[in-house]
């Protein structure tokens, strides 16, 4: 039953492996809860009070309401699938209301912080391969705004040196082409020279020193480690670099629709999240420049 749902997400919905794995973990977690608390294995006979008790149990683990809502959303999608395939008559989660969550304010890195990290690589006591690879990862995140999952799945063939672009496979396997800066291409050329000594013929662009495909946890550690040296911000992750990319473009007057395409968003509403920081900049300039801004 769960397997059929996961296949549906992969084949019909075109969800990424990362997303499908998250769904699988959530569903197995709920199934295990049913077995332990109710000695019940049949997911077709679930009622809302049982689901509610699972939510209460999750709340007691002190994980965030946002994470709980995501887990419940996975379960709701699963039961929608069962309803669609006529395995159940109604969705036991149809009237469920999400837990209240605080609005998250993503604080982007400043351009000075990003430049400090990029310039810091030459001073690192690492092998040249690791240093250049890590520098390329930072430059690529900031200059293209790609997601972490997109970065680790880039193949060498996705890079076009003649067009100065890189092909990115986004959510639901949607392709987009993102331009590359000359400085990034320079770093990329050097990285490919060094990579050849570690993994000849491996199609993945980013690899470990052992010649294996790079993985998400390592990418996170790279970003967190370098930015911890230059930034006091609470959150230092690949997503904050993506957020910085969008915010800085908008601050410099980039068109919202263009930023939407670069980020690979399916709707403009997703991109508008990044306009708040740009609005803050506009307000600051307005208050500093308007002749009557200091009058009471």
Residue ranges and their predicted role:
Residues 1-296:
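Conserved catalytic core of the tyrosine transesterase superfamily
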